[in-house]
């Protein structure tokens, strides 16, 4: 109806913010195939989080831009992010993905198999990421994706940057914890760790970072 106040679509509810509208548009612009949707359903079944479609599309693009021959992932989950990363990697690229939960790795492996991804293109490692990462070679990865417990983000950033070759990209998911990291009044352990990870990236002169407001926040940085 002409002249209607559009500040709220639902009586008593605040109108969505510009950021919320942009995020909804970004998410709605991405369509996922049946394999990704099935992997996402399995993530719900086993109680593990998964990147949103828009974050997945960003990962695919960054994997392609970085060269995508060697990618490391901290936090396998149900394989949703792995599928997106592999979609942007080169045909002979190898995804090394780490998770402490064997069930996550099993479900992710099922998703990779259903997508027709050969076993030579994935390396699934069960263990604590802090320990596994120290065994990976310096300057050897095109992209490192961190999607694990926010408390440990600073450790993963330090190790992840070490792994990057020149021109490689580190990507940290849940970099804003929704809007919590940006609220000065919030100072719990998770937020403190996320802010420390962001500080480490911002103060590393080898890195050029950008914070992307998708999902729970994506902090990406390319290494000189």
Curated annotation (Swiss-Prot):
Xref: CDD domains: AdoMet_MTases
UniProt keywords, alphabetically: Methyltransferase, S-adenosyl-L-methionine, Transferase
One annotated GO molecular function: S-adenosylmethionine-dependent methyltransferase activity
UniProt-listed PROSITE patterns: SAM_OMT_I
Pfam family, one: Methyltransf_3
Record-linked InterPro entries: Cation-dep_OMT, SAM-dependent_MTases_sf, SAM_O-MeTrfase
Annotated positions binding substrate: 147
Region (Disordered): 1-20
EC class (word): transferase
Protein origin, superkingdom: Bacteria
EC identifiers of the protein: 2.1.1.-
Residues engaged in binding S-adenosyl-L-methionine: 51, 73, 75-76, 81, 99-100, 149
One Gene Ontology biological process: methylation
Polar residues bias locations: 1-11
Annotated family: Belongs to the class I-like SAM-binding methyltransferase superfamily. Cation-dependent O-methyltransferase family.
This protein's name: Putative O-methyltransferase MUL_4520
Organism (species): Mycobacterium ulcerans (strain Agy99)
Lineage: Bacteria, Bacillati, Actinomycetota, Actinomycetes, Mycobacteriales
């Amino acid at each position: 109806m002409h002249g209607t106040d559009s500040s709220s679509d639902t009586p008593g509810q605040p109108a969505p913010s510009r950021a919320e509208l942009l995020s909804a548009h970004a998410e709605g612009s991405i369509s996922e195939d049946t394999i990704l949707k099935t992997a996402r359903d399995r993530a719900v079944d086993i109680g593990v989080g998964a990147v949103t479609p828009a974050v997945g599309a960003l990962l695919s693009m960054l994997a392609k831009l970085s060269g995508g021959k060697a990618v490391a992932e901290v936090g396998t989950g149900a394989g949703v992010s792995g599928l997106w990363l592999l979609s942007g990697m080169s045909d002979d690229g190898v995804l090394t993905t780490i998770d402490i939960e064997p069930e996550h790795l099993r479900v992710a492996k099922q998703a990779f198999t259903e997508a027709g991804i050969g076993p030579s293109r994935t390396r699934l490692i069960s263990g604590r990421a802090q320990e596994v990462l120290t065994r990976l070679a310096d300057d050897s990865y095109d992209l490192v994706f961190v999607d694990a417990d926010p408390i440990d983000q600073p450790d993963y950033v330090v190790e992840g940057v070490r792994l990057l070759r020149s021109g490689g990209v580190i990507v940290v998911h849940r970099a804003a914890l929704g809007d919590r990291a940006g609220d000065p009044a919030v100072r719990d352990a998770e937020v403190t760790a996320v802010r420390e990870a962001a500080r480490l990236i911002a103060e590393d002169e080898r890195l050029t970072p950008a914070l992307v407001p998708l999902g729970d926040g994506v902090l990406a940085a390319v290494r000189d």
